[in-house]
Design a protein with these regions (language model features):
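N-terminal beta1-alpha1 ligand-phosphate binding loop
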Residues: 2-28
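Hydrophobic anchor at the start of a short beta-strand
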Residues: 3, 31-32, 138-139
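Short histidine/acidic/glycine/proline-rich micro-motifs that form metal-
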Residues: 11, 112-118, 145-150
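Short gly/ser/thr-rich secondary-structure transition/capping motifs
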Residues: 28-37
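Short, well-ordered alpha-helices that flank and scaffold nucleotide-derived cofactor binding pockets
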Residues: 19, 23, 27, 129, ...
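Helix-loop-strand module that forms the ligand-binding subsite of alpha/beta enzymes
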Residues: 36-134
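Glycine-rich phosphate/pyrophosphate-binding loop and the adjoining helix
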Residues: 132-182
Length: 182
């Protein structure tokens, strides 16, 4: 079994969470991590488990307009935000809609502002809905991690790593494999 973590990140927070999730997941399953712009069909075809994530923008997944707004924020003279190199490309929404041969298993995660979920919404819920509609089976409930400013809180990174570890165990169980048998 192999896992692929595909993420969209504007300012680095979702990227950090994707790496932490992959670290936890790799304790049970060999795992690769790719930004959405680099996740091609070959990488997808090699995976049995897709872990897809992105930032929450305006109550859900990013859109072209919200990504353009993030680019403007980072470019403002008073801004201390650093844009990820792949930030202005297509997001996780566009990637999922165009991806062929999705793995049979998936998990979804997002990052969001440190506010009540009913105020911020959740990209992970929408990601999960798309992947279920495309025929994949959800392994665990979506993971949501707080992303304050341009530097995700260390406790959230730890939570993401633990979520990845639990995901690995659940994915193996879904496949009828024990963690010790790897």
């Amino acid at each position: 079994m192999r896992a692929l973590v595909v993420y969209e990140s504007m300012f680095g927070n979702t990227h950090r969470m994707a790496e932490a999730i992959a670290e936890g997941l790799s304790a049970a399953i060999p795992t690769s991590v790719l930004p959405v712009g680099s996740a091609d069909q070959d990488a997808l075809a090699a995976a049995d488990l897709l872990v897809a994530g992105g930032p929450t923008h305006v109550h859900g997944m990013s859109r072209e307009a919200t990504r353009a707004e993030a680019v403007r924020w980072a470019g403002a003279p008073e801004s201390d935000l650093t844009l990820e190199p792949s930030a202005s490309r297509d997001g996780i929404r566009e990637w999922m809609e165009s991806a062929d041969n999705l793995p049979g298993l998936f998990a979804a995660f997002d990052t969001r502002a440190d506010a009540f979920k009913w105020l911020t919404g959740s990209a992970a819920g929408q990601i999960a809905k798309v992947l279920r509609r495309r025929g994949s089976k959800q392994v665990v409930p979506p993971g949501t991690f707080l992303a304050p400013d341009n530097d995700a809180d260390g406790t959230e990174v730890d939570r993401a790593r633990e979520w990845g570890r639990a995901l690995g165990e659940a994915a193996l169980a879904a496949r009828g494999v024990t963690a010790s048998a790897g």
